[in-house]
Amino acid sequence: MDPCECSKTGSCNCGGSCKCSNCACTSCKKSCCSCCPSGCSKCASGCICKGKTCDTSCCQ
């Protein structure tokens, strides 16, 4: 899957699995958005990004 191009457009939608706003990923699957930190690799399906950190709200 191609990564989001938020740096170019300021917004994106990667195949429905990623939503970005103001060059920031607001929700994504780890295969799409770089904002999901490496710790989120344990998530089986998707990852909810809260800033730049992986906390208890990271994995859904």
From Swiss-Prot:
SUPFAM superfamilies: Metallothionein (SSF57868). Residues 29-60 are annotated as: Alpha. A divalent metal cation 3 binds at C14, C18, C23, C28. Transmembrane segments: none annotated. A divalent metal cation 6 binds at C36, C40, C43, C59. The keyword Metal-binding applies. InterPro entries: Metalthion_dom_sf, Metalthion_dom_sf_vert, Metalthion_vert, Metalthion_vert_metal_BS. A divalent metal cation 7 binds at C49, C54, C58, C59. GO terms for biological process: angiogenesis; positive regulation of cell migration involved in sprouting angiogenesis; positive regulation of vascular endothelial growth factor production; response to cadmium ion; response to copper ion; response to methylmercury; response to zinc ion. A divalent metal cation 4 binds at C32, C33, C43, C47. A divalent metal cation 2 binds at C6, C12, C14, C25. A divalent metal cation 5 binds at C33, C35, C36, C49. Keywords: Metal-binding, Metal-thiolate cluster. Gene3D superfamilies: Metallothionein Isoform II (4.10.10.10). Pfam families: Metallothio. Residues 1-28 are annotated as: Beta. A divalent metal cation 1 binds at C4, C6, C20, C23. Belongs to the metallothionein superfamily. Type 1 family. Class I metallothioneins contain 2 metal-binding domains: four divalent ions are chelated within cluster A of the alpha domain and are coordinated via cysteinyl thiolate bridges to 11 cysteine ligands. Cluster B, the corresponding region within the beta domain, can ligate three divalent ions to 9 cysteines. Metallothioneins have a high content of cysteine residues that bind various heavy metals. This is Metallothionein.
